[in-house]
UniProtKB/Swiss-Prot annotation:
Entry's localization field: Nucleus, Nucleolus
Sequence similarity: Belongs to the DEAD box helicase family. DDX48/FAL1 subfamily.
TM region(s), chain numbering: none
Helicase ATP-binding domain span: 57-227
EC number of the protein: 3.6.4.13
GO biological process: maturation of SSU-rRNA from tricistronic rRNA transcript (SSU-rRNA, 5.8S rRNA, LSU-rRNA)
Protein name: ATP-dependent RNA helicase FAL1
Annotated organism of origin: Debaryomyces hansenii (strain ATCC 36239 / CBS 767 / BCRC 21394 / JCM 1990 / NBRC 0083 / IGC 2968)
Entry domain remark: The Q motif is unique to and characteristic of the DEAD box family of RNA helicases and controls ATP binding and hydrolysis.
UniProt keyword Nucleotide-binding, yes or no: yes
A GO molecular-function annotation: RNA helicase activity
Helicase C-terminal domain boundaries: 238-399
SUPFAM superfamilies linked: P-loop containing nucleoside triphosphate hydrolases
Function comment: ATP-dependent RNA helicase involved in 40S ribosomal subunit biogenesis. Required for the processing and cleavage of 35S pre-rRNA at sites A0, A1, and A2, leading to mature 18S rRNA.
Length: 399
């Protein structure tokens, strides 16, 4: 199911200023959605709209530019997917909606959510991502895809090759907008936007919306509806957060080895800041006879797919990764996240540890810190208004 966690949802508080004129819909029926879409929503396992869904879906359907802020676990993917599916004309084969995501995995996952929600609607949707054969994209697009979910590089390439016609696109969705804007996709998004018809509806969805993102999206949007979460609710409830003080960087490895038995109780993700570090740590763990798998952005797509598949099915239990994994990928069993390195970008902290409390499961996040990292840890605490306690001696007490 989409990234929905009822505990997290119940904790959400929206900024009164941003939502005061927005009607809250307590049921999907009250939205007057197409019957086939409603069947897809219930078939997918939703019973009632989440907090963000009850506010944002109807704004999207009304055609207004919309900026919706909601963290992992709130059903935000389904929010824009439902809004989009309601306005799609299934009789036309033309591309009518374009979703842009910062990672291939997220683009594929969104396509899967759209497919499931649109199960009874005969909707054609395609994931247009790098790392796959261009010929396959061209073939699929020629067959007619009403919804395209993709990464900016491949999408702009398909538009320039004239394989993706933009004249009937009525909605552009930017998912994880903060990541799209800050990780070098800004120019490609501007370029894509220039190819779209004037007056195209823009929907911006993200867990964190910095002032910079709001300024940039201001260039695309006209008088947007803003549905914003209060800043102090942005960290995930239900995640216990700890730090372990390590005398020096080299000692982090021994600390991790001591924790390994606890890691494999369920499944764990270990985050490093660079692919070099991911490869180094993976080699060290394997040399010490620990079973781990690794993933980072430089791997070929089929290799990443295979690793993700093994991890999803539980064949592998410990994944070492860079932030490429931190956004939008659902693995239900993950209940422990270890930050071997603290994230260089404070806003990525919520994306990393947000993995571990999905689907109402309580999670644990452990941060390994040296003296040099202490200031960074304090910055994270201030940013999210949280306290990251020192880890108890017996790790099993917290699992």
């Amino acid at each position: 199911m989409d990234d929905f966690d009822r505990d997290v949802d119940n904790e959400l508080e929206f900024s009164a200023k941003s939502t005061k004129n927005i009607k809250v819909h307590a049921t999907f029926e009250s939205m007057n959605l197409k019957t086939d879409l409603l069947k897809g929503i219930y078939g997918y396992g939703f019973e009632a709209p989440s907090a963000i869904q009850s506010r944002a879906i109807m704004q999207i359907i009304s055609g207004k530019d919309t900026i919706a802020q909601a963290q992992s676990g709130t059903g935000k993917t389904a929010t824009f997917s439902i809004g989009m599916l309601e306005v799609i004309d299934t009789k036309s084969k033309d591309c009518q909606a374009l979703i842009l995501s910062p990672t291939r995995e997220l683009a594929q996952q969104i396509q899967s959510v759209v497919k499931h929600l649109g199960d009874y609607m005969n909707v054609h949707t395609h994931a247009c991502i790098g790392g796959t054969h261009v010929g396959e994209d061209i073939k699929k697009l020629q067959q007619g895809q009403q919804i395209v979910s993709g990464t900016p590089g491949r999408v702009v390439d398909m538009i320039k090759r004239r394989n993706l016609a933009t004249r009937n696109i009525k909605m552009m969705i930017l998912d994880e907008a903060d990541e799209l804007m800050t990780k070098g996709f800004k120019e490609q998004i501007y370029e894509i936007y220039r190819y779209l018809p004037p007056g195209v509806q823009v929907v911006v969805v993200s867990a964190t919306l910095s002032r910079e993102v709001l300024e940039v999206t201001g260039k695309f949007t006209t008088d947007p509806v803003k549905i914003l979460v209060k800043r102090d609710d942005i960290t995930l409830e239900g995640i216990k957060q700890y730090h372990i003080q390590c005398e020096k960087e080299d000692w982090k490895f021994d600390t991790l080895c001591d924790l390994y038995d606890s890691l494999t109780i369920t499944q764990a993700v270990i985050f490093c800041n660079t692919k070099v570090k991911v490869n180094w740590l993976t080699d060290q763990m394997k040399k010490a006879n620990f079973t781990v798998v690794a993933m980072h952005g430089d791997m070929k797509q089929d290799e990443r797919d295979s690793i993700m598949n093994d991890f999803r099915t539980g064949n592998s239990r410990v994944l070492i990764s860079t932030d490429v994994w931190a956004r939008g990928i659902d693995v239900q069993q993950v209940s422990l996240v270890i930050n071997y390195d603290l994230p260089t970008d404070k806003e990525n902290y919520v994306h990393r540890i947000g993995r571990s409390g999905r689907f109402g499961r309580k999670g644990v996040a452990i941060n390994l810190v040296t003296k040099e990292d202490v200031d960074e840890l304090r910055d994270i605490e201030r940013f999210y208004r949280i306290r990251i306690k020192e880890m108890p001696v017996n790790v099993n007490d917290i699992m």
